A protein has these predicted regions:
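Conserved small/polar residues in nucleotide/adenosyl-binding loops
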Residues: 18-19
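Domain-level signal for Mg2+-assisted phosphodiester chemistry and nucleotide/NA-binding surfaces
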Residues: 22-23
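Mobile genetic element proteins and their domesticated derivatives, centered on retroelements
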Residues: 26, 60-61
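Conserved interaction-surface patches within small, structured recognition/assembly domains
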Residues: 41-55
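Compact nucleic-acid interaction/catalytic patches
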Residues: 61, 65-82
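C-terminal low-complexity, charged extensions that often adopt amphipathic alpha-helices
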Residues: 85-116
Length: 116
């Protein structure tokens, strides 16, 4: 999954990452409940990313005009996502950080990568 594969997402203004471990058995309703009940946020106009105990799979939800979409990705190789686990929070990501995360790059790197 990279930003090119999900080109339809760029119309969403915000990419938000839930840093705490998520029970990956949760459905759309369960993931929406995390956002609405723990953080008093609505899911409109944002892509929300979730990761479980194993960092080899993620879920994402986003709201469209006619419903809510859930995307699930499990890495098939030995790789894993470098998911920030500071505390239970929703963290705002730039689209560049989203692309780094999907590419396996740590988004909490001490030095920024220079744009080419």
């Amino acid at each position: 999954m990279n930003i090119q594969c999900l080109s339809f997402i760029n119309c969403y203004t915000t990419c938000l990452l839930y840093t705490s471990r998520t029970d990956m058995r949760k459905s759309i309703d369960g993931l929406c409940a995390i956002i609405q009940e723990q953080f008093s946020m609505e899911i409109d106009h944002a892509l929300f990313l979730f990761c479980g105990r194993k960092c080899d799979r993620i879920k994402a939800i986003l709201k469209e005009p006619d419903g809510i979409v859930m995307i699930y990705k499990r890495l098939t190789a030995q790789g894993s996502y470098r998911w920030p686990r500071n505390k239970s929070e929703v963290r705002n990501l730039t689209w560049r950080e989203f692309d780094w995360l999907m590419s396996g790059i740590d988004i909490e790197q001490p030095k920024a990568i220079k744009a080419t």
